[in-house]
């Protein structure tokens, strides 16, 4: 495969543009926004260039392709042409061996140095740590007279190697920081150099250069001034933790438990001051066996207090009198207990922080599983929607232009492309086990049409991308079963054309998509359930306690609604009855009382209805001119049945005459 030499950007763009047909120049404008140039690979002479033998379904009969050497007619006269068969992932790249971009190399170097992940990064940084540690050991040995001669000579050459190494690494770090948007340009590099860890690296390099330049006769740390700079080389140990994760963890623990630490330190400091002062008062005139006053000043007492309450106990100063010993013992028990508390607080804080990080990791695993479950559930729901937006993700986008076909790449290059894509996905944080849901592409049988004779089938088969998610729909081949079939001009193989519009989807396509979506939903549901499983007994206990708390809240809400509906017991239960029977205040007893009240109310309503019926019958009898039977019998116009019942008659039940007598 011949590839053109790398001309300037403008000339290469003009050459690519001139080789494109008129219908493709519009689509080639997308390459202007890409940092890579759009190049067409040519294999052999231009006459041997091949087009894809598949045409869009909307075209009834494709026009024969024009030679690249001939002038391209307008797009309207040329008619629709077959789409390009290049892989969309590499359509903007040259078919030659891909050249690594400058920004891509910067990004890989930056991630390798500043964001180490993987065993290669670990091996590199661990080796640097070992070299720095060995150099530090030789620096310590150079201060011992027994090993000074051997250590200083070896240390001199090690310092030269480390200065060159750290200086080169500092320059490479400064250069690779340009892949970040905030570190682009001169001011961006200065912003990167102002980082604390970058300042430490620069100080270490400069200090090492000063040590090597001032050292005489190959002897490092020869003068007293150079020995003072030796401390700066200890800062190389900070090179191991460039991200500052250790300091951030310590700072977060101290910030979270700042109140407890401040309280314990304050009380311990007060205990130290008072104990030192009282011991000084008791021991300021005491003389030891050698005739010397041990606590001659308050500063001596403070030194004794610090050594005692921190449980160091040098033994250089000891109380001599029994009063001083008693005061020292009492205050020591009190002060030591408070000075030991910060260690326990920090230890428990670190343990809680580690546990919190583990829970956060476990929770972060649930996020992609939950997102996949929501996505698949929505797709299952949307599969019943006949709108075109539901099915657009399964439609292959038609290319706007038409380009020349290139021979299939070698297996080695395709493997390199796959490996490169895997590395890019890994750098972007996408692990192989957490890939996004695949969207299958649907292909269908194209309409019967006349193919040009110079379109070989083998080249088409190699140009169509095969994937496990590709749904292929093919018709059975025609078999020559009799002599009449021999006269038919039949195709030996049925070609598959990608579906480019929703209207081309058939019913079996939609049914297949629904089945795939349902399967994806069940798989996502299973993964989400696995991610939701607790990984610790404490999580199980926490879930049970949270569930119990929610249950109690709901029970209280139900109790409040019942009190609002049927009333509280204190509203209709006398105080004397509350102490007699506790069970009468239960919900069942209250409901029984409500039912009794409803029954009494129903009886009253029945009585009122009977009285109203009697009044209605009396009124109807008067209207017809007839006398009321009771009036004819008694003749008493003041009969109470002739009038409406009073309030007492409705509320107080009537008594029988026998009971009244």
UniProtKB/Swiss-Prot annotation:
A 1,2-diacyl-sn-glycero-3-phospho-(1D-myo-inositol-4,5-bisphosphate) binds at residue 243. The chain crosses the membrane at residues 120-141, 153-175, 192-217, 226-241, 260-282, 322-347. The modification Phosphoserine is found at residues 27, 406, 408. InterPro entries: Ion_trans_dom, K_chnl_volt-dep_KCNQ, K_chnl_volt-dep_KCNQ_C, K_chnl_volt-dep_KCQN1, Volt_channel_dom_sf. It is found in: Cell membrane; Cytoplasmic vesicle membrane; Early endosome; Membrane raft. Tetramer. Heterotetramer with KCNE1; targets to the membrane raft. Interacts (via C-terminus) with CALM; forms a heterooctameric structure (with 4:4 KCNQ1:CALM stoichiometry) in a calcium-independent manner. Interacts with AKAP9; targets protein kinase A (PKA) catalytic and regulatory subunits and protein phosphatase 1 (PP1) to the KCNQ1-KCNE1 complex, allowing PKA-mediated phosphorylation and increase of delayed rectifier potassium channel activity. This is Potassium voltage-gated channel subfamily KQT member 1. The lineage of its organism: Eukaryota, Metazoa, Chordata, Craniata, Vertebrata. The gene is KCNQ1.
């Amino acid at each position: 495969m011949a590839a053109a030499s790398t001309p300037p950007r403008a000339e290469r763009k003009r050459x690519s543009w001139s080789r494109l047909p008129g219908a493709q120049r519009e689509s080639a404008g997308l390459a202007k926004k890409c940092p890579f140039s759009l190049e067409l690979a040519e294999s052999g002479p231009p006459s041997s260039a091949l087009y894809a033998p598949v045409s869009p379904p909307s075209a009834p009969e494709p026009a024969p392709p024009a030679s690249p050497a001939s002038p391209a007619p307008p797009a309207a006269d040329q008619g629709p042409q077959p789409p390009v068969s290049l892989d969309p992932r590499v359509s903007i790249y040259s078919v030659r061996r891909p050249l690594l971009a400058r920004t891509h190399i910067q990004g890989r170097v930056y991630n390798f140095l500043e964001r180490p992940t993987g065993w290669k990064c670990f091996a590199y940084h661990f080796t640097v740590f070992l070299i720095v540690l060995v150099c530090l050991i030789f620096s310590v040995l150079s201060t011992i007279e027994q090993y000074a001669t051997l250590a200083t000579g070896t240390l001199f050459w090690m310092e030269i190697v480390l200065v060159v190494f750290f200086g080169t690494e500092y320059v490479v770090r400064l250069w690779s920081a340009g892949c970040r948007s905030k570190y682009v340009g001169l001011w961006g590099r200065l912003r990167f150099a102002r980082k604390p860890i970058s300042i430490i690296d620069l100080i270490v390099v400069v200090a090492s250069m000063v040590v090597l330049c001032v050292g005489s006769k190959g002897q490092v740390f020869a003068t007293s001034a150079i020995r003072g700079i030796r401390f700066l080389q200890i800062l190389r140990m900070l090179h191991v933790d460039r991200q500052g994760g250790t300091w951030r963890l310590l700072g977060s623990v101290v910030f979270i438990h700042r109140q407890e630490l401040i309280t314990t330190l304050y009380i311990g400091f007060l205990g130290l001051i008072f104990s030192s002062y009282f011991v000084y008062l008791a021991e300021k005139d005491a003389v030891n066996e050698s005739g010397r006053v041990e606590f001659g000043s308050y500063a001596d007492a403070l030194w004794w207090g610090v050594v005692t309450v921190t449980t160091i106990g040098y033994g250089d100063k000891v109380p001599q009198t029994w009063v001083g010993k008693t005061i020292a013992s009492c205050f020591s028990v009190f002060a030591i207990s408070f000075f030991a508390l910060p260690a326990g607080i920090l230890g428990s804080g670190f343990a809680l922080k580690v546990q919190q990080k583990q829970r956060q990791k476990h929770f972060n695993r649930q996020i992609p599983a939950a997102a996949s479950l929501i996505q698949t559930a929505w797709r299952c729901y949307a599969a019943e929607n006949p709108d075109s937006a539901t099915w657009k993700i399964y439609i292959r986008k038609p290319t706007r232009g038409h380009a020349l076909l290139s021979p299939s790449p070698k297996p080695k290059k395709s493997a390199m492309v796959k490996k490169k894509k895997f590395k890019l996905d890994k750098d972007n944080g996408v692990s192989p086990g957490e890939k996004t849901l695949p969207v299958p592409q649907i292909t269908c049988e194209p309409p019967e049409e006349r193919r040009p004779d110079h379109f070989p089938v083998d080249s088409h088969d190699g140009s169509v991308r095969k994937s496990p998610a590709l749904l292929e729909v093919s018709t059975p081949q025609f078999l020559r079963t009799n002599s009449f079939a021999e006269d038919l001009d039949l195709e030996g193989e049925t070609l598959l054309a990608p579906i480019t519009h929703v209207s081309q989807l058939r019913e079996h396509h939609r049914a297949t998509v629904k089945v795939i979506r349902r399967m994806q939903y069940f798989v996502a549901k299973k993964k989400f359930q696995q991610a939701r499983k607790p990984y610790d007994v404490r999580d199980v206990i926490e879930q049970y306690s949270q569930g119990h708390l929610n249950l109690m809240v709901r029970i209280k809400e139900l109790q409040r609604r019942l009190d609002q509906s049927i009333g509280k017991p204190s509203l209709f239960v006398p105080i004397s009855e509350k102490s007699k029977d506790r069970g009468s205040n239960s919900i069942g007893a209250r409901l029984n009382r409500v039912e009794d009240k409803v029954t009494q109310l129903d009886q009253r309503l029945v009585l009122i209805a009977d009285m109203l019926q009697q009044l209605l019958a009396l009124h109807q009898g008067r209207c017809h001119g007839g006398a009321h039977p009771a009036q004819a019998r008694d003749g008493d116009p003041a009969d109470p049945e002739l009038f409406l019942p009073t309030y007492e008659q409705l509320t107080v039940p009537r008594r029988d005459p026998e009971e009244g007598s």
